[in-house]
Design a protein with these regions (language model features):
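Acidic/His- and Gly-rich active-site-bordering loop/insert found
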Residues: 1-98, 119-122, 317, 334
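Secretory-pathway/membrane protein signature
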Residues: 1-13, 17, 41-43, 75, ...
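Metal-dependent amide/peptide-bond hydrolase catalytic core
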Residues: 30, 158, 172-368
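A structural signal for isolated positions on well-ordered beta-strands in alpha/beta enzyme cores
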Residues: 47, 70, 127-129, 273
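Hydrophobic/aromatic beta-strand patches that form the interior of the parallel beta-sheet core
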Residues: 69-71, 129, 152-154, 173, ...
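Acidic-glycine-rich active-site phosphate/pyrophosphate-binding loop
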Residues: 76-91, 165-176, 297
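Glycine/serine-rich anion-binding loops at beta->alpha junctions
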Residues: 93-109
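Acidic/histidine-rich catalytic neighborhood of metal-dependent amide-processing enzymes
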Residues: 104, 108-172
Length: 368
């Protein structure tokens, strides 16, 4: 089936421009300004939604329309690993650069078909939301759902074009240990909070691998208080835990608390704690109903394999779901490329995603 997105040059140029704008979380100003001007230039009724600190979301909401679905992309990226690898680099079909997969490829893939329909005179019952802050607190999406409600959302996170009707849950954990500051030459085994925390981390790792192997855990940060030539007073670690949509996350949290309590009983010198900073439940949507059928039809007509999967990371979809919005993730690129040193996305996939969204929007125009 031929491409529905006629202006492939414009799509590729937009993707290149987005990658070339450095936009780590908290510093999205330049990319917001660029896209605001870009959408205004093409006569879309774009507006800024302030989220605090001079930061903003970009929204296009057709006036006098009952919105059926919102297309969501996040404009921020993680911080750069290497400043020399910031800019866009093209190797035939492969487009490299920070945010190429997560998720500037996805942003381009929803902006171009939306823009194409407007240029053709259509006013679909579809909103466009380009949000800030997804990589950290999700403050852009939190602000979005305070003011707006949509029945459905499509999020262009990297899913290798697999439609994701289900989504993993997520727990962000902090564990801490405290001790007594003393001269380094007087340190005795077992009373250093760093050692105490390492013993707890080993125990938690054993729990995850032996008792809950279905969970995906990551020890993200480990740091102690600055102490110089002395025993540090505190040590902290941050963990990410992802779990399947049906996992008993309440029971998992209790089991983790019990492990810390047991550690205290077995080691009187251990002064530690565990806290759950963020808890997002997973969800499962049935692959039926209007949007599922429309999407299946698009895949059939484009001869694409219909292989739904569960999205295995946390994302703004968790926040949309908690706000009563039904999110489906579908985008170009894969999580295996996201946040990597040589992040990349296939332009062929970006184009394919853009065609899928073009056809999906067209089907909604026909149902008005």
């Amino acid at each position: 089936m031929p491409s529905a997105v006629e202006n492939q040059v414009r799509l590729r140029t937009l993707l290149r421009d987005l990658i070339n704008i450095y936009s780590p979380t908290g510093k999205e100003h330049a990319i917001v300004e660029f896209l605001f001007s870009y959408l205004r230039k093409h006569s879309l009724p774009v507006k800024l939604q302030q989220i605090g600190g001079g930061r903003a979301n970009l929204l296009v909401i057709p006036p006098e329309k009952e919105i059926a679905v919102v297309l969501v992309g996040h404009l921020d990226t993680v911080a750069a690993h290497d400043l020399d690898l910031l800019t866009c680099r093209e190797k035939d079909d492969l487009i490299e650069g920070l945010g190429a997969a997560d998720m500037k490829g996805g942003c381009a893939a929803i902006v171009e078909p939306y823009l194409a329909h407007w240029k053709q005179g259509r006013r679909p019952p579809v909103a466009l939301a380009l949000v800030s802050g997804e990589e950290e607190e999700g403050d852009g999406t939190r602000t979005l759902v305070k003011e707006y409600r949509f029945p459905w959302a499509f999020i262009a996170e990297p899913s290798n074009l697999h439609p994701c009707f289900s989504h993993y849950g997520y727990i962000e954990i902090r564990i801490s240990a405290t001790g007594k500051r003393m001269h380094a030459s007087l340190a005795t085994g077992g009373k250093n909070p760093v050692e105490a925390l390492l013993r707890l981390l080993i125990r938690l790792s054993r729990y995850f691998t032996e008792e809950r192997p279905e969970l995906v855990y990551n020890i993200r940060d480990l740091s102690s208080s600055r102490s110089g030539f002395a025993v540090p007073e505190t040590c902290d670690a941050s963990l990410d835990v992802h779990f399947a949509p049906t996992a008993p996350f309440g029971a998992i949290m209790m089991e983790l608390e019990e492990i810390v309590a047991e550690q205290k009983k077995q080691d009187a010198s251990f002064n530690g704690s565990i806290s759950f900073l963020n808890v997002h439940s997973g969800y499962e949507l049935p692959q039926q109903g209007e949007f599922a059928e429309k999407l299946k039809r698009v895949y059939e007509e484009r001869q694409l394999p219909w292989e739904p999967q569960a999205f295995p990371s946390h994302s703004d979809a968790n926040l949309l779901w908690a706000a009563g919005i039904k999110p489906i993730i579908l985008g170009p690129g894969g999580l295996e490329q996201a946040h990597s040193l040589h992040e990349s996305v296939s332009f062929e996939q970006v184009l394919a995603a853009s065609n899928i969204y073009y056809d999906l929007i067209a089907s909604l125009c026909g149902s008005e």
